[in-house]
């Protein structure tokens, strides 16, 4: 019984150490593009957004009428890239909205590594843009 308890504790400790050192990979895992045939049905402008810590983030901007319409700030979410979200952006085509979608640090070719504080900074930089 004592041997079983020792092995259980060792396995548990190993699991905790593993999760601690690999948590970033488990939380922010880039995904493959599963939407190869999707095409944007609206015109977009590729933009670069500078963050306070000096990173440049890739984004796509679509403007219908900046004075008449609200602007949606859209984050592509965990994993994937901007291209993975084309099928979602096409839903904005018939709406009277402008939109800006940005790729987080570490995604879509952007430099940096994703972290909670970095994601906040990316969001604030996009809002200020």
Model-derived regions, located:
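An N-terminal hydrophobic leader/cap segment in hydrolases
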Residues: 4-50
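Membrane-embedded segments
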Residues: 52-129
């Amino acid at each position: 019984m004592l041997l079983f308890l020792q092995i259980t504790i060792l396995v548990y400790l190993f699991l905790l150490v593993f999760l601690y050192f690999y948590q970033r990979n488990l939380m922010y895992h880039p995904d493959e593009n599963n939407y190869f045939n999707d095409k944007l049905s609206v015109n977009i402008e590729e933009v670069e957004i500078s963050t306070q810590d000096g990173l440049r983030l890739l984004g796509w901007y679509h403007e219908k009428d900046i004075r008449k319409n609200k602007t949606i700030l859209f984050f592509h979410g965990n994993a994937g890239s901007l291209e993975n979200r084309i099928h979602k952006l096409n839903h904005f085509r018939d709406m009277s909205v402008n939109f800006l979608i940005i790729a987080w640090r570490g995604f879509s070719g952007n430099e940096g590594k994703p972290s909670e504080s970095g994601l906040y900074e990316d969001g604030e930089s996009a809002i200020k843009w």
